[in-house]
C-alpha cells in the first residue's frame, strides 16, 4: 500500500509523504517513508524512525503496544482498555487517569520535568492551577490573579478549529490541515496557543506523541490510522 501527499508553500510544491505500508490482518506492520524530512517550523510529517520488518506491535485486542518509528517502547492499557501509560525509549512517560465511565481526568507528562493537566468537567487545570474553562464555541483563560480572557473559535464544516480570536477580535491562532488531520507548519500561526485542532479534538504534541484524543481511541494523523 502506498500513500503520497503533496504539500505547498508560497513558493513551491514539495513531497510531504510517500509512505509504503506493510499491512497484515488489517494492522500496519511497518512504514517506509520515501520523502525527505521537513525542516519547516512546526511541520507535521511522518517521522521514519526505524527500518525493521515489524515496527508496530499489538496486543490480543488489537491495541498498539509498541511504535518503533515514534521511539515508543511500551504502551499500556487499564482493565477497561483505556490508554494508561506510554513509555518512550529515552525514559520519558505520558500517563492517563480516567473515571469509572472512561472519561479522562488527568494527563501526566514525565520528562526532564513533570507536568500535569487535570480535567474537571469543563475546567482545565495545568500543574494544579486553573488554566481555562471550555464552553461551546471557545474557552476562557485565566491569569495568575484569575482574571478571565475570552477566546472564540472559527470552525470549518468538519468542526476543525481554523482560527482563534480574542474578545477584541484579534487573531490569536490560525490552523490549516492536511486531509488526514495533519497541521500545516509554515502557514499556521501560534499553534501552541491551545490544543484543540482537527474536528475539535485535543492534539497531544508532547514528546513527539502527535495523537488526537477521540475519547475511546487515539488517532494518528501522520499515518491516518487509529491506534
State each model region's role.
Residues 1-151, 168, 187-197:
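Acidic/glycine-rich beta-solenoid
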Residues 209, 223-225:
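Coil-to-beta-strand transition motifs
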Residues 82, 103-104, 215-217, 225:
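Short, cationic motifs built from Arg/Lys/His that form the positively charged side of catalytic pockets
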Residues 83-86, 183, 225-227:
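Blade-edge beta-strand/turn elements of extracellular beta-propeller
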Residues 131, 143-216:
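A motif-centric feature for acidic-aromatic and gly/ser/thr-rich catalytic loops and repeats
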